């Protein structure tokens, strides 16, 4: 069934003004009244329709990633990885797949400035011949927590105070003082990378661990990385204040204007691979979303390029109604047992159904471009015209059959039901290595940002001491420097 065939036609193809039902409107300037100065009549259907439609223009904003901008383009394979995956869209160099990409800030509201210190979303929807593939990531390769059970509380802590609606450091530092796994993410967020110059000069990452499966059924863990061809650029504090003060939508404008001018942004896609049989060789768990995979041991392998060469036609239809879901994969790609990814698989689709309705995948921007067939019928805002008589399976009256079986990871799981943490936490090694890799001036800016955050008057001595301890375990001199700036002697 073609989801585009029965779309409502655009109102712009009429030479005159009409109501939603197509009736001609001869006056769109005045309400119907009794005489010149009398009361407005309820029978003025056009007025009622116009106001009722206006009252419902806004839909619930995303609980995270509310502020965003989208663009369209293509992904082209440049390197053969068929030994790793049987995914059709990766079948050979030169193959192109249409995409739509949404960039976003994470925590703040839909109209917030794009210069705030905040992670950035980097989500790509591939419209492949075997269905859509949503690679839903961020600009940082790690995350704050490794188990989705903590995600709602984490977002609550990062969001504004429910009493004052002000984002406050004491709430953030209090919550994450219970989660030393967050140190690695903070080594990115409080670094210079914390405020990208714009979306074009920003890296992307799939963040979670996925799996690639080849035709023989061999599976590998995989991490996805996007590298901008124009380089990475960021804004320091004074620059961010200046840019944000002049235009709170500067990154959206930069993306739109660049594409309109023919200066198409481009990213190279790289992957890192781990054989699941070798996962015990590392001092970290490959399914731990708070860890990066060392590139000197697990080098980046080139796959293809992403080019954005077309602006969206309508912001609401192709940005606000654009919906991603990490569970949407294609044959040859599979979700791993990464705890955060497993919870995202449920949460994203549940949020989209709340925000857009149960048939959100029928919206043109979310619908697959390839032929598709199932018995998912009816529900709120179902606008697919279907005339079949058989809406069950199997049936001798419907020739539709099962697709050809494709490989999935052949893993065998044993264990008892439990709520537990992973064995290899190793929370301090990677953030310490990252800090020591910076030049002294970059280290100094990082320290100043932490001093500023810990200077919040509602941050208690206990919370400060915990953070001094954490950063001392990552790098002994770092914890000491932060403590000395606050005139506090660290406990270790």
Curated annotation (Swiss-Prot):
GO biological process, any: hydrogen peroxide catabolic process
SUPFAM superfamilies registered for this protein in UniProt: Heme-dependent catalase-like (SSF56634)
Domain of life from the UniProt record: Eukaryota
UniProt keyword Heme, yes or no: yes
GO CC terms of this entry: peroxisome; plasma membrane
Binding-site residues, heme: 348
GO MF, one example: metal ion binding
Reactions catalysed: 2 H2O2 = O2 + 2 H2O
Keywords assigned by UniProt, alphabetized: Heme, Hydrogen peroxide, Iron, Metal-binding, Oxidoreductase, Peroxidase, Peroxisome
Required co-factors: heme
Active site positions: 65, 138
Protein function: Occurs in almost all aerobically respiring organisms and serves to protect cells from the toxic effects of hydrogen peroxide.
Record note on quaternary structure: Homotetramer.
Entry protein name: Catalase isozyme 3
Upper taxonomic lineage: Eukaryota, Viridiplantae, Streptophyta, Embryophyta, Tracheophyta
């Amino acid at each position: 069934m073609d989801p585009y065939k029965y779309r409502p036609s655009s109102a712009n193809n009429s030479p005159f003004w009409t109501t939603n039902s197509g009736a001609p409107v001869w006056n769109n300037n005045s309400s119907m009244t009794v005489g010149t100065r009398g009361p407005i009549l309820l029978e003025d259907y056009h007025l009622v329709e116009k106001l009722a439609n206006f009252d419902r223009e806004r839909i619930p904003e995303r609980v995270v990633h509310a502020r965003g901008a989208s663009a369209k383009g293509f992904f082209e394979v440049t390197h053969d990885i068929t030994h790793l995956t049987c995914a059709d869209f990766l079948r050979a160099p030169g193959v192109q797949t249409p995409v739509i990409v949404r960039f976003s800030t994470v925590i703040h509201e839909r109209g917030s400035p794009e210069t705030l210190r905040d992670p950035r979303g980097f989500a790509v929807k591939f419209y492949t011949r075997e269905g859509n593939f949503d690679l839903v990531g961020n600009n940082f390769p790690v995350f704050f927590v490794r188990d989705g059970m903590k995600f709602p509380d984490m977002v609550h802590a990062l969001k504004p105070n429910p009493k004052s609606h002000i984002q406050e450091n004491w709430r953030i530092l209090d919550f994450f003082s219970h989660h030393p796994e967050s140190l690695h993410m903070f080594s990115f967020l409080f670094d210079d990378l914390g405020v990208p110059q714009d979306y074009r000069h920003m890296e992307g990452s799939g963040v979670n661990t996925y799996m690639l499966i080849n035709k023989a059924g061999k599976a590998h863990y995989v991490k996805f990385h996007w590298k901008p061809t124009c380089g990475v650029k960021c804004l320091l504090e004074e620059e961010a204040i200046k840019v944000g003060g002049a235009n709170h939508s500067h990154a959206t404008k930069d993306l739109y204007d660049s594409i309109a001018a023919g200066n198409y942004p481009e990213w190279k896609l790289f992957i890192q691979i781990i054989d699941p049989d070798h996962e015990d060789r590392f001092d970290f768990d490959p399914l731990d979303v708070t860890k990066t995979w060392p590139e000197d041991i697990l080098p980046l392998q080139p796959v293809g390029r992403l080019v954005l060469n077309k602006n969206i036609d309508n912001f609401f239809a192709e940005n606000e109604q654009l919906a991603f879901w990490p569970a949407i994969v294609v044959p040859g790609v599979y979700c791993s047992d990464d705890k955060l990814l497993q919870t995202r698989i449920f949460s994203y689709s549940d949020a989209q159904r709340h925000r857009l309705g149960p048939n959100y995948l029928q919206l043109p921007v979310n619908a697959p471009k390839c032929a598709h067939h199932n018995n998912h019928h009816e529900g709120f805002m179902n606008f697919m015209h279907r005339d079949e008589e058989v809406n069950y399976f199997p049936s001798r009256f419907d020739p539709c059959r099962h697709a050809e079986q494709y490989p999935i990871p052949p893993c065998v799981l044993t264990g008892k039901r439990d709520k537990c943490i992973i064995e290899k936490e190793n929370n301090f090694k990677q953030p310490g290595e990252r800090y020591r890799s910076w030049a002294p001036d970059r280290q100094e800016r990082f320290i100043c940002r932490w001093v500023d955050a810990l200077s919040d008057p509602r941050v208690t001595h206990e919370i400060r001491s915990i953070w001094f301890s954490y950063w001392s375990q990552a790098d002994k001199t770092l914890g000491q420097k932060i403590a000395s700036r606050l005139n506090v002697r660290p406990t270790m």
